[in-house]
Regions:
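Buried, small/hydrophobic-residue-enriched core segments of structured protein domains
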Residues: 1-14, 23-25, 61-62, 67-76, ...
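Short coil/turn segments at secondary-structure boundaries
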Residues: 54-55, 123-127, 141, 433-440
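Flexible, glycine/charged-enriched surface loops at secondary-structure junctions
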Residues: 182, 234-243, 269-271, 430-440
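Short hydrophobic alpha-helical runs that function as membrane-insertion/retention elements
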Residues: 181, 273, 294-297
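An N-terminal, globular interaction/scaffold subdomain
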Residues: 41-46, 81-84, 88
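Short acidic, Pro/Gly- and aromatic-enriched capping/linker segments at domain boundaries
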Residues: 79-85, 394-397
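Gly/Ser/Thr/Ala-enriched C-terminal appendages of enzymes
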Residues: 1-13, 27-28, 278-468
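Intrinsically disordered, low-complexity, positively charged segments
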Residues: 1-61
């Protein structure tokens, strides 16, 4: 497409593209916007090497002038986006690119794969951590991830979503995600007996001993050996057994029985961690059943978002600039949900006096919502359903993040993004955060934007009718 734009003399024709999604994975009430800093890093380095251009030349089908154009290519547009870590909802632009058409199209694939993947994993992590009710959750999924990049960037997204740490050491090297690890069954099996394995591990890591106790039998072997280790190895060193991990069996029964026996041995401070195919629903059930669990290691169902492994974000043109004038664009479809909302836009989040989010309003870019006057919300699919709100304040969510070849906002740390997620979640009503059958959060259109969309749809309908 970029080559076609160039050969048609449209290399400097500017457009606006919106990134948004149509439904929340797992029928949830919200999503977490993640991956923005990764996109900005890509934009910063985006260029074409001589080898890449030669490959395109040999492949054929590319205009030589276009190949020369790529030699000096740098992204020359603007990017507007929600803050990374924001809670977001369907059918509102999370990121808008305003740039020459070629620039917009070249960004598309990387932008989609990055924001879709990281938003998916961050959203899944937030759901899982919410069900843990303050207990620590660890990301254990690298070995089941869909490749090395998915493991690495998945760990980043999971940390943003709320996990305490990851078993992916490279994620700490690259992003600063705290790395953790425990022993594997192979370590236990490599010794003559379980106790010898535990003793060797404790001698190596006396300050951080966490034992995997289900290699043979949790209650008849693993736990008794763990208690013996505390008494015979760690206690003489002035150390304490940090924890045990159970990776199989009835986790509710085993954790409760282990807790009883640990407490009876004076090991009330020894934590119990579990793993084994966990997700938000299983964690919720374990806690409701009274399981004595202090932490959860969550693997494949987090790192692959196994229950719904696709975040359906799309990237659509909404405006084209000709002779200095913006011309809104709309795509219609047999499926109503796929009809786009035209024009360069802003998203306003409305908060009540208690700082709880009450609705998002998608408006034309030039509109302002300031809360000084009552404001009427309406359902864009059923405009007769209206509600007037007052005593609120409105926050513009799409902020300029890239201009003139550089980022224009201070780069947040990953810990700051993670903390922002929690502050955002605190603005949502419990009904919106319900695991099942959540209340639908309102995303409305402003009256001028709704009018524009309807006028364009009516115009297209008339053209189609006249063309019959």
């Amino acid at each position: 497409m970029a080559n076609a734009y160039f050969t048609q003399g449209r290399a400097q024709e500017w457009a606006v593209f919106d990134y948004y999604f149509r439904r929340v994975p797992d029928n949830g009430g919200f999503a977490i916007f993640a991956g923005l800093e990764t996109v900005l890093d890509y934009v910063r380095e985006l260029s074409f090497s001589a080898e890449q251009i030669d490959f395109l030349r040999q492949k054929g089908g590319f205009d030589e002038g276009f190949l020369q154009y790529l030699r000096d290519f740098r992204f020359g547009g603007e990017i507007y986006a929600f803050t990374e870590g924001s809670v977001v909802f369907p059918n509102e632009p999370l990121l808008s690119v305003r740039a020459p058409l070629i620039d917009c199209q070249i960004l598309e694939t990387f932008l989609l794969l990055t924001l879709n993947h990281q938003s998916l994993i961050a959203t899944k992590a937030a759901r899982i951590c919410a069900q843990a009710q303050g207990r620590k959750v660890f990301e254990f999924g690298s070995r089941r991830a869909h490749g090395a990049d998915a493991a690495l960037y998945g760990a980043r997204a999971a940390y943003i979503g709320g996990v305490a740490a990851s078993a992916n050491t490279q994620a700490e090297v690259v992003f600063g995600v705290p790395a953790v690890g425990t022993m594997a069954h192979a370590f236990v099996q490599s010794f003559a007996d379980e106790y010898s394995a535990f003793a060797a591990y404790a001698q190596t890591y006396p300050d951080h001993t966490v034992l995997l106790i289900d290699t043979y039998d949790v209650l008849r072997s693993g736990l008794p050996n763990a208690i013996r280790l505390q008494q015979e190895v760690l206690q003489p060193l002035g150390k304490r057994l940090k924890g045990i991990r159970i990776d199989s069996g009835d986790l509710t029964y085993l954790s409760r029985r282990c807790r009883e026996l640990l407490d009876a041995a004076g090991m009330q401070d020894c934590e119990i961690m579990v793993s084994n195919g966990l997700d938000e629903f299983i964690i919720k059930d374990l806690i409701q059943q009274g399981a004595a669990i202090d932490g959860f290691g969550v693997g494949e169902r987090l790192i692959t978002a196994r229950s719904e492994p696709v975040f359906g974000g799309v990237y659509k043109i909404v405006s084209l600039e000709k002779a200095g004038k913006a011309e809104p664009k709309i795509k219609i479809s047999e499926n109503l949900i796929k009809t786009t909302t035209p024009a360069f836009k802003q998203v306003w989040r409305l908060y009540n006096q208690a700082q709880m989010a009450i609705a998002d309003v998608v408006s034309l870019r030039e509109e302002t919502i300031d809360g000084s006057q009552p404001y009427t919300l309406f359902d864009p699919q059923a405009p007769w359903k209206r509600k007037t709100v007052q005593d609120f304040h409105a926050k513009p969510c799409l902020q300029l993040v890239w201009q003139d070849g550089k980022a224009v906002q201070k780069r947040p740390t990953l810990a700051e993004i993670r903390a922002y997620v929690q502050s955002e979640l605190n603005t949502l009503w419990c009904e919106v955060k319900r695991l099942e059958n959540p209340h639908g959060y309102y995303v409305d259109l402003s009256q001028p934007l709704w009018n524009l969309k309807q006028d364009m749809l009516d115009g297209i309908a008339k053209e189609m009718e006249a063309g019959r």
